[in-house]
């Protein structure tokens, strides 16, 4: 992925298998992040890019609130799923990376949710994305995203015992999930996610790799990309970021 501006590995099973795509929102329920970003964007109509939109839940929410929304994701299966959801007609959907975004009017805000920023594995990936977002933002526009704070070491809970969950899907019935086998290579954490479909006994595995970047390094890269200012929060209530204790590293970057 060196030099690309993809925000999620489009070849991972999680993003390519239609059964797992359909389960994504069930396993990632809750809207604390969406509520936080929506409050930062405000109620006045804005032109918004949802970068790495996944199943499109937040993009549809923004469109329903009256915003002009373009949503992109490098995984066609995610975009196909998003297009079939209620309210999808109000959003412009594109299966592409940021560098493949067609020319158009600048955006007032770019959002990247779901810890998608951590799929940028190299310095080149991060820098290309930050510079690319800066280019498509209008003066005074904002880039809002989050990543996990490496100091808290969230991966230590990605064990079968601590990560086990289950959902009951109308299409698939009961499905269990757990993480296992995490490995650390510098700033990159690799792990597997295992799925068990009770209805037919199907077992699926998706391998993931995430980058954990320190706030100091990320702050410098944001400014180097041409942003004038950045505010850091440490949780979805808006508390200031504390490197020792904050689980989240939430950025509001001003162009």
Q: What is each stretch, according to the model?
A:
Residues 2-46:
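Conserved class I S-adenosyl-L-methionine
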Residues 52:
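Conserved S-adenosyl-L-methionine
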Residues 56-100:
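Class I SAM-dependent methyltransferase SAM/SAH-binding core
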Residues 101-109:
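A short acidic, Gly/Pro-enriched loop at the edge of an enzyme's catalytic core
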Residues 108-124:
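A short SAM/SAH-binding and catalytic strip from SAM-dependent methyltransferases
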Residues 127-139:
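A short glycine-rich, Lys/Arg-flanked "PGG" loop and its adjoining helix->strand segment in the class I
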Residues 144-219:
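SAM-dependent methyltransferase
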Residues 209-255:
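C-terminal lobe and adjacent flexible extensions of AdoMet/dcAdoMet transferase-like proteins
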């Amino acid at each position: 992925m060196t030099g690309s501006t993809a925000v999620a590995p489009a070849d991972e099973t999680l993003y390519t298998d239609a059964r797992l795509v359909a389960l994504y929102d069930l396993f990632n329920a809750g809207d604390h992040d969406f509520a936080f970003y929506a409050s930062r964007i405000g109620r006045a109509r804005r032109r918004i890019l949802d970068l790495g939109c996944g199943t499109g839940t937040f993009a549809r929410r923004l469109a329903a609130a009256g915003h002009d929304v373009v949503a992109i994701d490098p995984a066609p299966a995610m975009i196909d799923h998003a297009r079939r959801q209620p309210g999808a007609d109000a959003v412009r959907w594109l299966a592409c990376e940021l560098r493949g975004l067609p020319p158009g009017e600048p955006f007032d805000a770019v959002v990247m949710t779901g810890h998608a920023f951590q799929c940028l594995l190299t310095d080149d990936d991060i820098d290309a994305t930050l510079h690319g977002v800066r280019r498509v933002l209008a003066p005074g526009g904002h880039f809002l995203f989050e990543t996990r704070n490496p100091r808290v070491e969230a991966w230590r809970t990605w064990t079968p015992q601590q990560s086990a969950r289950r959902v009951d899907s109308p299409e698939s019935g009961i499905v269990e999930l757990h993480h296992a086998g995490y490995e650390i290579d510098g700033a990159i954490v690799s792990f597997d996610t295992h799925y068990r479909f009770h209805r037919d006994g199907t077992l699926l595995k998706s391998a993931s790799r995430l980058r954990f970047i320190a706030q100091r390094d990320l702050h410098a890269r944001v400014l180097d990309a041409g942003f004038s200012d950045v505010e850091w929060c440490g949780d979805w209530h808006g508390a200031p970021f504390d490197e020792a204790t904050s689980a989240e590293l939430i950025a509001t970057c001003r162009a």
